[in-house]
């Protein structure tokens, strides 16, 4: 039978519940347990797919094509279990499901209320999500409840968790509460009162946490831990200090050293093997002792909120680990390139243009593509970054001066990138969309396997085929591919059913390393293995740096 760990947060948001939950999962998995994680989001949106990156940060795409919270990316990076659509749900999905049942008459004319109907539906979603785990029936399901205790939006989820714990019985569920212990510089001390009040608020709704994770910018002294224990009614050994570190991959060891996994296993009556965190220690060792160093420019329009590129940043960090190369990421606002030109790119060892939507800043990104191509600097374009690379090549090499995407200019006569109106989903069913379709759920989403053209750089990186996740509406227009190929561009991978370009590159005679991909490889990168595309990209950046150094010498 699956046991449950509910992770809640207090005082403020963005304390790192996702990292804490993922780290606990990593420790439990290292002890031989099968673990899955779920994220419950209290907003009314059905999913984050149509939310602004400035509001929500990154949208993480699962293998089965769900647009989910970025915390699911952390989950996949920390444990071996893959996430699915069922691992993330929102208030919007819960209410949508309940209203649909009410319309069908499932409630037999009863008054539909938050309790019991909404809370029962939340419990059903939790148990369904745990049961659908890719690892088989999990020993432990860790359920992260989004938001902050005290928020009105989170109340139905907390009430559902309380009811579920009661229903499952003793030693079947436990609660971990993450809270803030701020340091007041003017007073020169840590303050525990916010934590005391947060736990009090949690207890008011019937939940007594078994463990407190106390976030601070420094380790919490024993006397402060004793005070927290006294006023929150949590045993002193269950008041765990979680301080700021320079790498999230240090967190599993930090939590294990303070006995978090022991406390959880004791409460849930689990007796697994001892934890083996040698892999995490080795990763941290490699991360902190690089042999080389490169600077990669990430050109985008969401650079003021790096959470928008969370998986991409982590993928570069994983490549850093596996190439013994420290990767410095320089965030470059593409709109500034439109105004000031590309001189600010001259010191970079490589250029990366990530995915994105909308017209704003695209000409600055195209300028960055042009710079990378002409200066022979390694270039990686992801999703929109590939489309813009094709547009730049069409304009500046092939001579299609009005080449553009219909996303930015619906009336362009040279539609090098356009909306595809019909395609096959992962199950082989035909999906259709138009310019007037809803934004939500009308993209090519999820994993797709594609064969790779022999003799290409793509084959050297991936092998015979590539299986990556997608999130896009627009595609490179096959009508212009013959002209692009005549100019030297290579389409190195295509979808097997629609024959749509999935990867493009420039031959070595034109550029040492220039690759565009329509998919999002960052979603499948893990610290354990890295990712072949990002490792190759970092190695190319290092080679570029060494070539420059040799030329100067």
UniProtKB/Swiss-Prot annotation:
Pathway: Pyrimidine metabolism; CTP biosynthesis via de novo pathway; CTP from UDP: step 2/2. Coiled coil: none annotated. Disulfide bonds: none annotated. Residues 1-270 are annotated as: Amidoligase domain. GO terms for cellular component: cytosol. CTP binds at residues 13, 151-153, 191-196, 227. The keyword Ligase applies. Transmembrane segments: none annotated. Allosterically activated by GTP, when glutamine is the substrate; GTP has no effect on the reaction when ammonia is the substrate. The allosteric effector GTP functions by stabilizing the protein conformation that binds the tetrahedral intermediate(s) formed during glutamine hydrolysis. Inhibited by the product CTP, via allosteric rather than competitive inhibition. Its EC number is 6.3.4.2. L-glutamine binds at residues 356, 384-387, 407, 473. It comes from the Bacteria. GO terms for molecular function: ATP binding; CTP synthase activity; glutaminase activity; identical protein binding; metal ion binding. Residues 295-547 form the Glutamine amidotransferase type-1 domain. It holds the Pfam family GATase. It catalyses: UTP + L-glutamine + ATP + H2O = CTP + L-glutamate + ADP + phosphate + 2 H(+); L-glutamine + H2O = L-glutamate + NH4(+); UTP + NH4(+) + ATP = CTP + ADP + phosphate + 2 H(+). GO terms for biological process: 'de novo' CTP biosynthetic process; pyrimidine nucleobase biosynthetic process. The active site is at 383 (nucleophile), 520, 522. ATP binds at residues 14-19, 71. Keywords: ATP-binding, Glutamine amidotransferase, Ligase, Magnesium, Metal-binding, Nucleotide-binding, Pyrimidine biosynthesis. UTP binds at residues 13, 191-196, 227. CTPSs have evolved a hybrid strategy for distinguishing between UTP and CTP. The overlapping regions of the product feedback inhibitory and substrate sites recognize a common feature in both compounds, the triphosphate moiety. To differentiate isosteric substrate and product pyrimidine rings, an additional pocket far from the expected kinase/ligase catalytic site, specifically recognizes the cytosine and ribose portions of the product inhibitor. Catalyzes the ATP-dependent amination of UTP to CTP with either L-glutamine or ammonia as the source of nitrogen. Regulates intracellular CTP levels through interactions with the four ribonucleotide triphosphates. Homotetramer. Belongs to the CTP synthase family. This is CTP synthase.
